[in-house]
Amino acid sequence: MKKSMFLLMVLLFCMTSVSAQYQNATEEQKKDIIGKITQASGDMKTMKCDFVQVKELSFMDDKVTFEGIMYYKKEDKIRWEYTKPLKSVFSMDGKNVYLKSGDSNASVMPVKSNKMFSELSKVLIGGVSGNGLVDSPDFDTQFMVGKDDYKIVLAPKKKEVKDLFSSVQLFVSKSDSRILSVELIEKSGDKTTISLKNTQMNIAIDDNLFSEK
């Protein structure tokens, strides 16, 4: 009996500790958060940063970790350049999606010809810049406030996005309204966490970088 009571108390403590990390935002806080992210996104013309991407599979305990460099240029250009453990590139120049593995030639697919790529580009670009995502009518959005950051949970409404993700979670710095990390939760329960670091803003980035050959 005592053991059962002890376990119950531990469980309740853990649940309280987790929930205490973030509190639901008030309506006034929501407006303030959206305003700050929109302002920060508007001020950001380009971005370059290192990233660490961790893939957690629902049916395995092991995690798969990738590292690389991400480039973004307003409005619709993004490049994920993976450097570890394997070299590959996923990039978009606003018109096409480019996929390249190792030294092979890139595969090219028009964004508009594929609804999935079109929606994916919005999620990826919005996920790293905040641009057009936090206030999008295409998502049911929940805002939460933590000690040093905001947590924004977006549940997609469109089928094309639902087929990819059950939710997108953004973690945003309170100090400068910059996206710190993105969590992509798939329908299968698999989770991908992308953490951004060593961020450089508004630097010169050549357009050719987004058109992989």
What are these regions (language model features)?
Residues 41-60, 71:
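A short, Trp-centered hydrophobic/proline-enriched beta-strand micro-motif
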Residues 132-213:
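Gly/Pro-enriched, hydrophobic low-complexity segments
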Residues 51, 78-82, 97-100, 152-154, ...:
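Short hydrophobic/aromatic-rich beta-strand segments that constitute the beta-sheet cores
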Residues 22-26, 38-43, 55, 63, ...:
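Flexible, processing/modification-adjacent segments and terminal tails
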Residues 16-21:
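Sec/Tat signal peptide C-region and signal peptidase I cleavage site
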